[in-house]
């Protein structure tokens, strides 16, 4: 071949071949004046002297597939040829040449390479080893000494040249570009359905009507709506509450998941109603302005707690919302059925005193003075009317043990219908407490002894100085109903009261 002959001539004419030296000599030629050109395909027993500034020589570059081998001399680099990788069927390429691949340097990579198929005919590949040096691979030696790099080759390659390292790198890069161009459309095609599915999902989410913010449900009191845990219905004119839940779905301890309704209407019982007394600085918060309001349909409220004969509403949160229950228990009134008898009459000399202390005894006796004139009977009528204001009919009422008949109330005169009557609450001194009641004849004071004083409210009411008060007492204007209202209430309840052989 012309290339081989030219290379042989260059080897004969090389400067390194003119000098006598061996790579294993202890002393190498010093300061050579000429250097050889770099040879990529050295073959045969040749010697070259390269300059230490030659880049390819510094890299120990060779067209043959050479790998590093063990060398006991640290100053000499020894490399052996690996051979060439060819097709097992010796197929020809389009240009008529044969496939001659460069063997991999790593042993594992080389074994993996042999298992691959020929890219041209898909036949298996095989490695043709180099045996050009007396049955051993051709060996190349590199040694740096001074300003020269000495190169020596031993053996003649008995196999065809593999593709060079630059050619191999170019082929690999071209193959990578081809594979990238092959997978890129597939990747785009695979990404397009994902993008379309994502857009579909987004479009579905966008098309779905967004949930409106939780509406503030208007809460109004309704006496016909039962609420578990609060059986007492509320009354009109109560405060409007706003919550964000659906109470009709609550059934005891079972809480169903929240469901949104377009226009829910949930009802809460409003604040319980109480009394309303007109006085200086004391005004109840009840929506009912009179004491004779019919309360026969009002059931027991579990939120009411009797303390000191006063009804406290534990669910009330207003500082001025208090409910004072003037019940028949204060004066040992006793319901009767049928004809009144001696056992069913009320003893006014034995009544239950209700002190302001939180600890009291219900059995403590209290006595009234002897029955005074007509003005006092009007006061007794006031007490009877107050009993008609009883809002809670407890099933078990305490009765007084001792009974005593009281003088007849035949001469008792009743207040006219809805006539305001001032009542003076007891003063600080129990002995000087004055209570006046309205009657056709006017106001008549009544002295109450200390052991049977009227119950005082223990609640905190805003008190103001009353210039018209008598002995520091406040005037309470109570709108009382006539006898008709009281009798109508008693007829509906079916429990008339007997007081001194007189049925009411």
UniProtKB/Swiss-Prot annotation:
GO terms for biological process: apoptotic process; epithelial cell apoptotic process; gene expression; glandular epithelial cell differentiation; intracellular calcium ion homeostasis; intracellular phosphate ion homeostasis; negative regulation of epithelial cell apoptotic process; parathyroid gland development. Zn(2+) 1 binds at residues 81, 130, 157, 159. Residues 155-203, 438-472 are annotated as: Disordered. Residues 155-172, 188-203 have a biased composition (Basic and acidic residues). InterPro entries: GCM, GCM_dom_sf, GCM_large, GCM_small, Tscrpt_reg_GCM. Its main location: nucleus. This is Chorion-specific transcription factor GCMb. It comes from Mus musculus (Mouse).
């Amino acid at each position: 071949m012309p290339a081989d002959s030219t290379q042989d001539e260059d080897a004969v004419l090389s400067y390194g071949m003119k000098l006598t030296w061996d790579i294993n000599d202890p002393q190498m030629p010093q300061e050579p004046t000429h250097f050889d050109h770099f040879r990529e395909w050295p073959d045969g027993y040749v010697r070259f002297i390269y300059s230490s500034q030659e880049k390819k020589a510094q890299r120990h570059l060779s067209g043959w597939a050479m790998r590093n081998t063990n060398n006991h001399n640290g100053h000499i680099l020894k490399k052996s040829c690996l051979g060439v990788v060819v097709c097992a069927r010796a197929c020809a390429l389009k240009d008529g040449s044969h496939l001659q691949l460069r063997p991999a340097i790593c042993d594992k990579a080389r074994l993996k390479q042999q298992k691959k198929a020929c890219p041209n005919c898909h036949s298996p590949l095989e490695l043709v080893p180099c045996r050009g040096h007396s049955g051993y691979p051709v060996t190349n030696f590199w040694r740096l000494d001074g300003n020269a790099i000495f190169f020596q080759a031993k053996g003649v390659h008995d196999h065809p040249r593999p593709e060079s390292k630059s050619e191999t790198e170019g082929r690999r890069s071209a193959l990578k570009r081809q594979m990238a161009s092959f997978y890129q459309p597939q990747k785009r095609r695979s990404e397009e359905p994902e993008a379309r599915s994502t857009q579909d999902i987004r479009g579905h989410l966008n098309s779905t009507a967004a949930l409106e913010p939780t509406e503030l449900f208007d809460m109004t009191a309704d006496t016909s709506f039962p609420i578990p845990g609060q059986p007492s219905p509320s009354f009109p004119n109560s405060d409007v509450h706003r919550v964000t839940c659906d109470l009709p779905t609550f059934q005891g301890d079972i809480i169903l998941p929240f469901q949104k309704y377009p226009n829910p209407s949930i009802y809460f019982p409003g604040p319980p109603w109480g009394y309303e007394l007109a006085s200086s600085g004391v005004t109840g918060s009840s929506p009912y302005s009179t004491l004779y309001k019919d309360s026969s349909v009002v059931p027991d409220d579990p939120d009411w707690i009797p303390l000191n004969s006063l009804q406290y509403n534990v669910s009330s949160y207003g500082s001025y919302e208090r409910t004072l229950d003037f019940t028949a228990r204060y004066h040992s009134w006793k319901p009767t059925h049928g004809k009144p008898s001696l056992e069913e009459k009320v003893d006014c000399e034995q009544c239950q005193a209700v002190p302001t202390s939180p600890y009291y005894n219900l059995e403590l006796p209290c006595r009234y003075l002897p029955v005074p004139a007509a003005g006092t009977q009007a006061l007794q009528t006031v007490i009877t009317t107050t009993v008609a204001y009883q809002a809670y009919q407890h099933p078990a009422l305490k009765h007084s043990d001792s009974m005593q008949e009281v003088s007849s109330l035949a001469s008792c005169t009743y207040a006219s219908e809805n006539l305001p009557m001032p009542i003076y609450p007891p003063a600080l001194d129990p002995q000087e407490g004055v209570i006046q009641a309205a009657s056709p004849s006017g106001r008549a004071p009544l002295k109450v002894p200390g052991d049977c004083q009227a119950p005082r409210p223990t609640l905190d009411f805003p008190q103001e100085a009353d210039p018209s008060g008598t002995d520091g007492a406040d005037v309470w204007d109570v709108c009382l109903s006539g006898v008709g209202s009281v009798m109508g209430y008693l007829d509906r309840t079916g429990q008339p009261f007997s007081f001194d052989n007189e049925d009411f």
